[in-house]
């Protein structure tokens, strides 16, 4: 089942000419590669989120996209930034607007309550 939902991401889709460096470029990249059927399935946000996070290098703290997401949203965790990209592409595919800031606030609140700085993921005393 997971293979089915990751098929949109595989290399045969279209190799990257260059890695997206901004939120908008990443959203556009994902948007162009997903179908309405894919985004409407609940597994998309799990498997699709993993594919976005890993495929766009969101774990690489030196990548331009990671640095952009940190500067723009104050988040460094790849699951959080991947969720923003995935949610935006999903909304766009459905002809809806997406405001990332409520999700950003929710992520920041989660990490702060857990005792971590969402910008660095370092433990805060």
Language-model-detected regions and their locations in the chain:
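Low-complexity, Gly/Pro
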Residues: 2-7, 119-125
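N-terminal low-complexity, intrinsically disordered segments
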Residues: 2-47, 60-63, 70
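Intrinsically disordered, low-complexity regions enriched in Ser/Pro/Gly/Gln/His and often acidic
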Residues: 1-2, 104
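Compact alpha-helical subdomains of small soluble proteins
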Residues: 37-124
């Amino acid at each position: 089942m997971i293979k089915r939902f990751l098929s949109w991401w595989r290399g045969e889709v279209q190799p990257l000419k260059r890695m997206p460096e901004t939120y908008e470029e990443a959203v556009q990249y994902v948007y162009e590669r997903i179908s309405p059927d894919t985004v409407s399935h609940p597994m998309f946000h799990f498997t699709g989120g993993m594919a976005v996070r890993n495929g766009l290098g969101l774990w690489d703290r030196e990548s331009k996209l990671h640095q952009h997401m940190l500067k723009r949203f104050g988040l460094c965790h790849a699951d959080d930034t991947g969720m923003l990209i995935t949610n935006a592409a999903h909304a766009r595919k459905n002809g809806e607007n997406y405001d990332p800031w409520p999700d950003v606030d929710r992520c920041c609140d989660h990490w702060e309550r857990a005792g971590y700085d969402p910008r660095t993921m370092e433990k805060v005393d």
